[in-house]
Amino acid sequence: MSDQALSFLKDFLAGGVAAAVSKTAVAPIERVKLLLQVQHASKQISAEKQYKGIIDCVVRIPKEQGFLSFWRGNLANVIRYFPTQALNFAFKDKYKQIFLGGVDRHKQFWRYFAGNLASGGAAGATSLCFVYPLDFARTRLAADVGKGAAQREFSGLGNCLTKIFKSDGLRGLYQGFNVSVQGIIIYRAAYFGVYDTAKGMLPDPKNVHIIVSWMIAQTVTAVAGLVSYPFDTVRRRMMMQSGRKGADIMYTGTVDCWKKIAKDEGAKAFFKGAWSNVLRGMGGAFVLVLYDEIKKYV
């Protein structure tokens, strides 16, 4: 195996393992966030049964659906996240060679910054093309609030994918893809671009204290998450459309979804669950730092 292939494989494994561990740890926060985001577009949650906020959601989930339901959809998320994060990190370095070849970070700061933004955004968009159906299934499984098998919309990951594919075809599994690409480019650009730029400005980027790394990563994930959050809300709402027919369809398209949320629920609705997203972002920050630490030993 060539050095290049070995380096790619190390990136793939380090990124994937770090991501799988952190995602499972923050899965309950992720599910609360998703429910708050999509409950207005759910056929299972009537207006009077909607969650009032994070605390109400955290209290009611174990009571109504059982404690383990906090991890509903987590298998899809781990399966999805392993290739997503691993491909992101692996492609990030390939894209960095394209966008940053021969750029001096101290003498050409803005070109260096722009190159980092471009490489981070391109890496995120590329990997999304491969794993979007898993992202879709993760959202639909997390939004499924039925308690027993009879009340559930889907029995599991395979059932969700096959049911929607039979109903809507491949298009159904890629519902909301366009707005996802927009959001992911904005998020990843900040996530990787600002993180790498900040680390690159330090005197000795190769030997940064783990606490400093974590603090930089924490700030980056919180800011990136909030900036791209409205795009995430719209894409999740669009995902909830798949499998619906006729009068059940809430939004005719992405633009209609943006308009209706703003008109019917107000601008605040775009940020429903955003606070839990900041908490979940701690897991994202942990991934960046853990990835750097794992790479030192492989």
Curated annotation (Swiss-Prot):
Mapped Solcar repeat ranges: 6-98, 111-201, 212-297
Q: Which residues hold ADP?
A: 80, 92, 235
Residue positions, PTM N6-succinyllysine: 147, 245, 272
What keywords is this UniProt entry annotated with? Acetylation, Antiport, Membrane, Methylation, Mitochondrion, Mitochondrion inner membrane, Phosphoprotein, Repeat, S-nitrosylation, Transmembrane, Transmembrane helix, Transport
Which positions does the record annotate as the modified residue N6,N6,N6-trimethyllysine? 52
Q: Name one GO cellular component term.
A: mitochondrial membrane
Main localisation? mitochondrion
Q: Which GO terms label this protein's molecular function in UniProt?
A: ATP:ADP antiporter activity; oxidative phosphorylation uncoupler activity
What does the UniProt entry state concerning the protein's domains? The transmembrane helices are not perpendicular to the plane of the membrane, but cross the membrane at an angle. Odd-numbered transmembrane helices exhibit a sharp kink, due to the presence of a conserved proline residue.
Q: What protein family is recorded?
A: Belongs to the mitochondrial carrier (TC 2.A.29) family.
> What is the protein name for this chain?
ADP/ATP translocase 1
Please name the gene that encodes this protein.
Answer: SLC25A4
